[in-house]
């Protein structure tokens, strides 16, 4: 039986001074030790998840760890989890980088109208959104072209290129079409960059009878889903800098796989994109369309002016 504290003060005196019984003292000590053990178990789980998804956030960690926490009979909420991660230096910070321009809409090629202003997809294969983002290299940048299904958020086509030309987006589009098979009734939405307006890209869309939709401004919120996917890959699943395009390409492929099959999405009721892709009219989306958000912003601005 423990009779003394580590500083040599008898427990009986400590209990008398604090007005607690010996039983209450040991109960509190047990609770403290139990909390320390639980914290260590949680941190180990977090480290395991972060081996694959290096910047996985607090809420998604809690969701993924729910079966483990239940099995271990550990009760921890979001705020306590946040505090535990902060005390252990495991909170995810923002990534800062030198951002190159990936969209050039000052060209002579035809710019198509926006077809999705009031559209909410109800199944996979109805609306694709495409965008280009940069990946930092030790010397310069590489450029990642993505095609994402707007309903399920699944990345259906991607390609990493050394140059900001149409070749990368074309290869990403060809991958998406090859995986989809049936493109009847499909709409493809993108910004008005030259890569998406050129004959090579538009020709493939027309050949596969895919309707062409483009943003009408330079506001990234007009292609919000594509921008969000870019952000998730770069902030959670990819490193800040790679030695060369080959090393970056290997990690991009791994990141897309992790994103599609392992990462739960709050906007998809915590399903992964791969699981959401197989559902029809069953998703509980926690989001509004970019057009609806734009209307709300405009209404709010008018309200502030009156």
Language-model segments: residues:
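Basic, flexible linker segments flanking DNA-binding modules
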Residues: 15, 22-123, 274-281
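Double-stranded DNA-binding cores of transcription factors and transposases
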Residues: 1-14, 18
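Mobile genetic element proteins and their domesticated derivatives, centered on retroelements
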Residues: 14-15, 25, 46, 61, ...
């Amino acid at each position: 039986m423990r009779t003394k504290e580590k500083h040599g003060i008898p427990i009986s005196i400590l209990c008398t001074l604090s007005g607690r019984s010996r039983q209450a003292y040991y109960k509190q000590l047990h609770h403290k030790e139990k909390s320390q053990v639980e914290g260590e178990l949680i941190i180990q789980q977090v480290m395991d998840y972060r081996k694959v998804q290096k910047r996985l956030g607090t809420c998604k960690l809690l969701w993924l760890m729910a079966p483990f926490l239940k099995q271990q009979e550990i009760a921890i909420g979001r705020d306590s989890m946040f505090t535990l991660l902060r005390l252990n230096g495991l909170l995810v910070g923002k990534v800062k980088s030198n951002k190159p321009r990936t969209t050039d809409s000052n060209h002579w090629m035809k710019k198509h109208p926006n077809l999705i202003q009031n559209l909410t997809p109800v199944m996979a294969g109805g609306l694709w959104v495409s965008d280009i983002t940069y990946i930092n290299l030790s010397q310069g940048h590489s450029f990642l072209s993505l095609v994402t299904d707007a309903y399920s958020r699944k990345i259906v086509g991607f390609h990493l290129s050394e140059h900001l030309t149409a070749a990368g987006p074309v290869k990403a589009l060809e991958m998406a079409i090859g995986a989809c098979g049936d493109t009847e009734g499909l709409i493809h939405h993108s910004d008005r960059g030259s890569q998406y307006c050129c004959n090579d890209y538009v020709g493939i869309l027309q050949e596969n009878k895919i309707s062409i939709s483009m943003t009408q401004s330079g506001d990234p919120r007009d292609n919000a889903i594509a921008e969000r996917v870019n952000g998730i890959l770069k902030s959670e699943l990819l490193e800040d800098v790679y030695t060369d395009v080959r090393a970056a390409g290997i990690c991009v492929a791994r990141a897309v796989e992790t994103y599609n099959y392992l990462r739960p999405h709050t906007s998809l009721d915590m399903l992964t994109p791969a699981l959401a892709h197989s559902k029809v009219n069953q998703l509980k989306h926690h989001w509004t369309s970019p057009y609806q958000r734009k209307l709300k912003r405009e209404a709010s601005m008018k309200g502030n002016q009156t």
